[in-house]
Amino acid sequence: RENVIDYSLLEFCLREDLNKTAPRVMAVLDPVKVVITNYPAGKEEWLDAENNQEDESAGFRKVPFSRELYIEREDFLEEAPAKFFRLSLGKEVRLKNAYIIKGESVVIDANGNITEIHVSYDEDSRSGSGSEASQRKVSGTLHWVSIAHAVEAEVRLYDRLFIDEAPDSHKEKNF
């Protein structure tokens, strides 16, 4: 009997299993530098981050936070449309397990590329603090890494192996 299972079912099953067992870390694949202008130079904090949101028994890990961070380049637009739920100038977002930041200005190189984003942070908005500022609603939450503590890593991004949903249905092609 021939059987073709939808790829999205496999992805769903993998996600379900990994959500229960995989340790969480933050990585930035296409970094842009963020400078928190009102955060003291030389200061660093070790913030608590859940090891697994779906398993309280997994505990917490410490994540370093400092004045200079990396975020994903795609998480920032200088002039963002209304439905952009990430960082832009004049807009607030939360840094995961950290603080609320607001885009203030950018540094652009000779080729027109953004090389730095300058932001301010709300010192009272630390995640989990229970303060009124920490419970403020913002448009999105971004993952990040502290530049001073970043390590290089090899990342393998996998996608679908075949373009066709049912590659074996083409008898003239050799798969």
Residue ranges of each PLM-predicted region?
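Basic, alpha-helical terminal appendages of large translation-related enzymes
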Residues: 1-175
